[in-house]
């Protein structure tokens, strides 16, 4: 003890005393616990005291005070540990017992909301010691220390023991042989040889009967602690030797302290933990903690608000048959079928749970659950807001999530073939929708804007197969968002009131999430209000400037992207999203932008296919995990025609994989989105992927992006001596790529002889790429003879298979030179009109040009009128016969626009139109941007 100077006594128990001491060797304050002097001569108690110290020393957890040192030399038996400033849980509870009025500070400290995180920390510590095979056996508020800096630690391990300890039997034998003077011992607070272990008030009923301790005895003690935290009262007071009928006297916490606003389910958790029968308690601490998680996270508790009977018309405000709208998702059944539509009479809250069961047969033709804004629903606009569509086909359940008539998420899962009826639960709370089927989570969607749906709609054919619908609303959540009030105003389109409250919240919580979230929603409110009033949407931009550089900085650009989206400024929208994603890539709010990208992808698939490819590329690059395997197949079907019309996809016969660099290059090519090309080039170089490098050069060259082409050319030249391609690539050398690059540059500079010599040294694929890059320039500049010369030089040594790729260019030259006989022969031999020609194919356009040369304008118009897609590329080329098509180009993706302008120019030349007409298209092509952002 010479190393320690005792300062003062800070605690005393049945077996030991705890002092604040000064450690001279380390110059620090410590807590020193030593065995009481009057008990130090007892060998068994010394042994137990040391066991307590060793158990504490073996356990490493934030909720357990670590042991610095243990001493058992001579008569001195003690151990030391860190000194934690604070107070016991008992002292905190005692400070409010039987007090009618509490100070604001004490009321906050002892609120249910404040106590639950403390209780969870206690449980976490007990869960840890149980995992190590240790039972505490004396859990009580007196043994819970609350530090001044948030520490929550369990102390006093005197009663602790290993669950399967061999020494337990030895101690019991020792206890039988030891004589004790019970007059000197307060057995209510210590472990006594031959007596029941623990503090009677916190002991489980079975422990009082002498049953061996278990994890469930610790759970019982924790239940009593939780009970006290909830009620600020003890459920009963047990006297020594007195038997008590617990069931008659223990009131549930919600009845014991009704003024505490204890959620009923939380009250039930406490009662389950202190059940008399151990089998009725929680099976483990983990199960107890899981039961508490909804309250710790602020999740709501639900109470039934209304029960809707499907066949009872009085439950519904609107109850009529409807013809299923074509704007609902594509169904296995025909959308022309009639369905029953019901709109609830009762309004639903922002946090609502919908529960019902339905038969498999009732869902066979599909059924829908809709969350509709009241005003839109009353106007008959039944496809605003969110909706869910359920259908069963071939024992597979499919659930689609719809937003404003657009399918934004879809999931399918096999069902048990014998299953006749299944339960569906839908939770909608603020910005979250969760769908559970048979208690398993099926779909989870988070929208970072307040949901506007406050009416429930049902669409179903078979009313017999649907149970009553229970509508519940949340009550008693321990954490309610302060944004709920203005969100409610926004949902009712009371924009001015919503704006007032959003501003108040913003100003009340500076630097906190609530503040920047309120400002973001304020901006959305103003944007929506201006849009409804038909004003200038860009006025809403300034409201998002407030977020600049702050904790919610990414939301500035998300908000501005929303403004540009609604204003139709697609390029500016993409700029904002890209800036936020690049500058704040590690910011916790970035998932919101990723989710927004996903919504915009699905939204544009229905409204602006030309925009969809850009969002598809961004998601592949930034958040590929957002796209499911099922969606991959769907997207591959959408781009199939473009894939067939892409030269580097025609050359490489391997199927285009959705998650691949080639797909990213493909999307970059069609969208003109060149931002990712440098990274694709670097990646291909590192992988020594010859074909990928060639494809990237082709994309940069054919799109007219000379800056990128020269950048890659310089980079390739710098490493040409270092790169050697593997044998599997037929020993293709970087030199061939360099010849190709220099050959293309020679073509641009109109040094055609040099170009021919350089390209002669390259394989056919690179020659074909150079030919395709050059052919547009040749026709626009009317350098046809030079093009024919190069074409012939490549055609002559080519194989029959290779010549097939060149045939289109030969036909173009015949058409340009008005050689109808040769053009017709090649077209009719290889692409006869009596066969079904795909409208996206080059041959379809060339036939139109041939018919134009014959002078039969009626035949030209009839040919292009066959196009299935009214505003597709081929259809628009046909429209240029009678008028300009510039107003329709926004419906096309970037590369389609360029090719439409070029081919319209070519067609008008074949029609022998006036130079004034076809020159407009030529100039439009030449002036068109070389990439997405120019």
Curated annotation (Swiss-Prot):
EC numbers for this chain: 2.7.11.1
Induction comment from the UniProt entry of this chain: Transcribed after 6 hours in infected mouse fibroblast cells, that is from the mid-phase of the developmental cycle.
Catalytic activities: L-seryl-[protein] + ATP = O-phospho-L-seryl-[protein] + ADP + H(+); L-threonyl-[protein] + ATP = O-phospho-L-threonyl-[protein] + ADP + H(+)
Keywords noted in UniProt: ATP-binding, Kinase, Nucleotide-binding, Phosphoprotein, Serine/threonine-protein kinase, Transferase
Active-site residues, record numbering mapped to chain: 138 (proton acceptor)
Binding site for ATP: 10-18, 33
InterPro entries hit by this protein: Kinase-like_dom_sf (IPR011009), Prot_kinase_dom (IPR000719), Protein_kinase_ATP_BS (IPR017441), Ser/Thr_kinase_AS (IPR008271), Ser/Thr_kinase_PknD (IPR023507), TPR-like_helical_dom_sf (IPR011990)
Catalytic EC class: transferase
SMART domains the record matches: S_TKc
Gene Ontology terms for molecular function: ATP binding; protein serine kinase activity; protein serine/threonine kinase activity
Chain ranges of the Protein kinase domain: 4-296
PTM characteristics: Autophosphorylated on serine and threonine residues. Present in elementary bodies 40 hours post-infection as 2 bands of approximately 55 to 60 and 45 to 50 kDa, which may be due to differential phosphorylation as well as degradation; an enzymatically active full-length protein can also be detected.
HAMAP family: PknD_kinase (MF_01957)
PANTHER family: MITOGEN-ACTIVATED PROTEIN KINASE KINASE KINASE 20-RELATED, SERINE_THREONINE-PROTEIN KINASE YBDM-RELATED
Record function comment: Together with the serine/threonine kinase Pkn1, may play a role in the specific interactions with host proteins during intracellular growth. Autophosphorylates and also phosphorylates Pkn1.
Family: Belongs to the protein kinase superfamily. Ser/Thr protein kinase family.
Known partners and oligomeric status: Interacts with Pkn1.
Name used for this protein in its record: Serine/threonine-protein kinase PknD
Species in which this protein is naturally found: Chlamydia trachomatis serovar L2 (strain ATCC VR-902B / DSM 19102 / 434/Bu)
Gene: pknD
């Amino acid at each position: 003890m010479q190393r320690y100077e005792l300062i003062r006594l800070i605690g005393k128990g049945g077996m030991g005393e705890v002092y604040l001491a000064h450690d001279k060797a380390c110059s620090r304050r410590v807590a020193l616990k030593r065995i009481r002097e009057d008990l130090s001569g007892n060998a068994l108690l010394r042994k137990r005291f040391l066991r307590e110290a060793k158990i504490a020393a073996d356990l490493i957890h934030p909720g357990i005070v670590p042991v610095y040192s243990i001493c058992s030399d001579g008569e001195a038996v003690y151990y030391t540990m860190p000194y934690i400033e604070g107070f016991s849980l008992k002292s905190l509870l005692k400070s409010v017992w039987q007090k009618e009025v509490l100070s604001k500070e004490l009321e906050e400290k002892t609120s249910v909301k404040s106590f639950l995180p403390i209780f969870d920390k206690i449980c976490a510590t007990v869960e840890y010691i149980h995992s190590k095979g240790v039972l505490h056996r004396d859990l009580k508020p007196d043994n819970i220390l609350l530090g001044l800096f948030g520490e929550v630690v369990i102390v006093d391990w005197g009663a602790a023991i290993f669950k399967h300890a061999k020494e337990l039997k030895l101690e019991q034998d020792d206890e039988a042989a030891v004589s004790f003077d019970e007059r000197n011992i307060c057995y209510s607070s210590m472990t006594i040889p031959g007596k029941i272990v623990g503090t009677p008030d916190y002991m489980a009923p079975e422990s009082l009967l002498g049953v061996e301790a278990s994890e469930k005895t610790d759970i019982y003690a924790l239940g009593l602690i939780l009970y006290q935290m909830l009620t600020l009262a003890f459920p009963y007071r047990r006297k020594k030797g007195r038997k008590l009928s617990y069931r008659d006297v223990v009131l549930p916490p919600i009845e014991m302290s009704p003024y505490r606003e204890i959620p009923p389910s939380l009250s039930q958790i406490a009662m389950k933990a202190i059940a008399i029968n151990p089998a009725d308690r929680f099976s483990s601490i983990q199960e107890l903690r899981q039961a508490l998680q909804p309250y710790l996270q602020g999740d709501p508790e639900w109470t039934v608000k209304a029960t809707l009977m499907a066949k009872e018309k009085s439950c519904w405000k609107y109850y009529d048959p409807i013809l299923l709208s074509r704007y609902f998702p594509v169904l296995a059944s025909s959308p022309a079928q009639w369905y029953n539509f019901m709109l609830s009479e009762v309004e639903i809250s922002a946090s609502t749970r919908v529960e019902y069961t339905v038969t498999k047969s009732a869902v066979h033709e599909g059924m829908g659950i809709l969350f509709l804004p009241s005003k839109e629903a009353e106007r008959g606009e039944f496809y605003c807001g969110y909706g869910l569509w359920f259908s069963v086909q071939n024992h597979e359940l499919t659930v689609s999530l719809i937003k404003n008539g657009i399918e934004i998420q879809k999931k399918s899962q096999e069902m048990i073939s014998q299953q006749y009826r299944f339960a569906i639960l839908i939770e909608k709370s603020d910005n979250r929708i969760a769908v559970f089927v048979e208690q398993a989570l099926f779909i989870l969607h988070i929208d970072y804007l307040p949901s506007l749906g406050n009416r429930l709609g049902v669409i179903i054919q078979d009313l017999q197969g649907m149970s009553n619908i229970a509508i519940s609303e949340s009550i008693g959540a321990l954490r309610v968002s302060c944004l709920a009030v203005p969100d409610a105003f926004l949902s009712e389109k009371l924009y001015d009131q919503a704006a007032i409250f959003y501003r108040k919240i913003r100003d009340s919580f500076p630097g906190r999430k609530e503040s920047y979230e309120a400002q973001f929603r304020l901006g959305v409110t103003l944007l929506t209000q201006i849009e409804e009033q038909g004003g200038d949407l860009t006025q809403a931009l300034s409201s998002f400037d407030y977020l600049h550089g702050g904790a919610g900085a990414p939301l500035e650009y998300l908000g501005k992207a929303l403004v540009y989206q609604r204003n139709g400024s697609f390029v500016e929208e993409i700029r904002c999203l890209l800036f936020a994603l690049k500058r704040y890539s590690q910011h916790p709010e970035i998932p919101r932008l990723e989710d927004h990208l996903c919504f915009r992808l699905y939204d544009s698939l229905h409204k602006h296919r030309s925009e969809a490819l850009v969002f598809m590329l961004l998601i592949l690059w930034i958040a590929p995990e957002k796209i499911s395997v099922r969606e991959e197949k769907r997207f591959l079907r959408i781009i199939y025609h473009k894939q067939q019309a892409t030269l580097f996809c025609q050359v490489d016969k391997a199927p285009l994989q959705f998650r691949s660099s080639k797909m990213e290059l493909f999307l970059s090519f069609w969208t003109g989105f060149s931002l990712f090309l440098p990274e694709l080039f670097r990646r291909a170089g590192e992988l020594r992927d010859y074909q990928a490098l060639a494809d990237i050069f082709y994309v940069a060259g054919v799109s007219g992006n000379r800056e990128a082409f020269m950048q890659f050319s310089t980079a390739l030249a710098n490493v040409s001596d270092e790169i050697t391609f593997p044998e599997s690539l037929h020993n293709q050398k970087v030199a061939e790529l360099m010849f190709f690059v220099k050959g293309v540059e020679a073509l641009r500079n109109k040094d055609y002889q040099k170009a021919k010599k350089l390209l002669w040294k390259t394989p056919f694929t690179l020659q074909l790429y150079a030919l395709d890059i050059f052919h547009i320039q040749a026709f626009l500049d009317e350098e046809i003879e030079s093009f024919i010369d190069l074409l012939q030089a490549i055609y002559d040594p080519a194989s029959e298979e290779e010549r097939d790729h060149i045939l289109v260019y030969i036909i173009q030259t015949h058409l340009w030179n008005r050689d109808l006989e040769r053009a017709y022969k090649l077209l009719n031999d290889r692409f006869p009109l009596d066969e079904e020609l795909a409208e996206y194919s080059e041959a379809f356009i060339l036939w139109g040009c041939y018919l134009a040369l014959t002078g039969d304008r009626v035949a030209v118009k009839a040919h292009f009128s066959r196009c299935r897609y009214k505003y597709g590329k081929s259809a628009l080329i046909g429209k240029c016969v009678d008028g300009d098509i510039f107003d329709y180009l926004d419906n096309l993706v970037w590369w389609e626009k360029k090719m439409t302008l070029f081919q319209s120019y070519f067609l008008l030349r074949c029609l022998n139109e006036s130079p004034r007409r076809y020159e407009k298209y030529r100039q439009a092509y030449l002036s068109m941007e070389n990439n997405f952002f120019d």
